[in-house]
Amino acid sequence: MSKFSITIWDVLKFEILNAQEEFLSEISLEVLQAITRRLSEGVTEVSQDLPLAKYLQPITKECNEQLQEPQHKQAKPSQSILSCVSAASPVSFTLVVRTVVPPIFTLYQEADGIVKQRALLDTLNVLFESATTVFGQWTTRGGEITIDNPLLEFRDQFSEIFGQVLMGAAKEEVSFRVTALKGFLRLSTLRAFFQDNEIGLFVQYLDEILLKEESVGRDDLKKEAIAALAEISKHKPRLIMDITFPAFVATLPEEAEGSEALYLPTLETLAQISVERDIFETLFRRLFSKLSILLQKEQPGSVAYPRAILVTLLYVMQQRNMEQDQSIDLYFDKIVVGLCRNVAASASGTAKNRILNDPTVLDTLGRLCNLLVRSVSTEKQAQVAENVYSLFTTSDEFVPVPFTQNPSADQQRTTIISTYLLAGLSKDCGNKLPHTNPDMSALLLDLIHRSVTSTEPAIHQAYLRQLALLVNKFLSKQDLAIAEKLFDSLLESQDTETKNLSPATIRTIFWLAKALVLRIAPTTTHVLTSLLALISSPDQQTSVTAAQSFAIILGEDDILSVTNGATIRLLCRQRLFTTVIPLISSRIREVNIAGTDDSAVITKVPDHIKPAHLTALSGILSTIPTALVMPELPTLLPLLLQSLDLQTAGSVAVRTATLDTLAVIIRDNGVVVIDQCGHVQSLVTRLLKTTSLNAGPGAVNSPRLRADALKCLNLLAVHQSPPGTTSNTRAPPGISPLLPVKNQVLRSLHAVLDDPKRDVRKAAVDARGAWLRGVDDAPEDDE
């Protein structure tokens, strides 16, 4: 190998330095590294007489020559060469460093501009990366190497140069400083290179950048500084706890006065660098102490600050595996037990302030409690189940909400917390819940009564979620009839003459239906047909509210989720789709026929019925996988087109959902599926009408709608073939189904280029370009 190694280098050099094909360059680099490894085998001492040294000599010489102008094109390939041969073994790394680093220092001192200096630092960073590969990081175990790291003799010079650039360069030279930061970070994590005090100096630099410097441009330097602190925390957590935490926590205010900018950046940084266990424990102690002080103040200021503290703790806990955390019981006692008691005190009016009466704070605290309850032992969960309404207090301290006559709004807001606690419990805890013996019929009835009468949105939503959670997760199969009877009783509460229901009652009906449909209860078909009947109500408010509520049934929810152990059957989406869609389609067809029949025999259908059914359709389709939709596309596409015909302000949400559905269909299946249904012209015409700022009298096309319609037009031109086929495969061969409407589209889009909204103009440019490039004119006949 040593005999021919230099000859091989001469051959491979051209492929790397003058790369025509990227894969050839990559293979050539792999060959160079393989030869370096082979020649390094059995070598324990560095010598210039080694075959390895003779092999590396022309390589390093060539690279040094190319690096004379490090900002030029061929310097990058030279860096790649140095990277692959230096990372092959400790001996090769030593030979490369001794040959390459001193000239780089000389070039750096003589450099006449920042561009050249930055390129030289990039080269050093490449060598630092190789050093990490060869010698490992602080966290690398085993693999002790007998050869000393050759970079050690340059340690002081590295520290001086990189520190000077990081903290001494002009603030506007962001990329230069980022390069220095990355190099400093690599050296700080390189095993046994810097002493702790030297890494600590780097940590101080990073803290100063984050705490004292103003943001520049896209904040790239600050983002890199945060990432660097997070990386150092894995290797040297004590430095972060001793240096960064005191500096950052000292900037947090004692109370929320003034702008959120005073504390949000600090909390965001602390959250991102505190995932490691030891550091998180420190973060928890510091922030929980801040929160406790705020809760004891009579005038703590805005609730945004304590909420931000809770959000920070929640974010970090979500990044960690809390089930394996050794301190989980401590967090449980402090947050779930301790803060829930504080919530009860606030609801009873005995707290010093109203922080824990705020629904947004309670929601964040609830999410935190939910995460912890899911992570604790069965015994702890049983404790939560027993205290889910009392919030770990006695009856003298706090009166739980269920069955309480006329509770205050503050008391009712505790339902937000109790709902999150319930969601975190396993199903096995169902028999330990209060008010469930012999069954939960009375509890469910109480919740329904509160749901239909509550007026505060946060409280109303908490009642709805808790009702659905109890029915879906904790109600046994044998007791399902309880929920089904309650569902029917709610429907029967309609006014016999006007057939109207209050919006709160309708939402209660749909959340109860959601609980039953997700678990595919025996009466699922009856439930769904009953919901559809509400859309046909002669009362417009009842019809419209019911139609908008169809998105609730399969919509994502943080409480009723798989994570929380809710019963969500795999076939629930298919069951809903196959039951409801044919009925909606049939009903719209009936309305269309009635609208065109002038016979006096046919009773006129109220104007709101058809838009309401289309609204329900869009709500359902927004939660249904495309694979279920495609077999029914010939039936659904005309309905989607009719949805785009709606032109009132109230239809914007429906049309937005319709455009989202169409975008997915086109992207996943190509324009051919639209063509097979025979609706290319109809679809394009409606999309163009939706892109118009002045589509006609009474028309409302919001900027979002206009941009979404343009996105669909763009997708039509880009995805003319189904996935898996070549771009030239079309039906009929060679002619695009979009060709007949190409001129119409280009003319219309030309007008949209003057839209007052920038996002719309950009979407129009993209769509017009796609049609010009992608929709070919018909081929001329050969003579």
Functional labels for PLM-detected ranges:
Residues 725-730, 734:
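Intrinsically disordered, low-complexity regulatory regions of eukaryotic transcription factors
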Residues 782-783:
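A beta-strand edge to alpha-helix "cap/lid" segment located at domain peripheries
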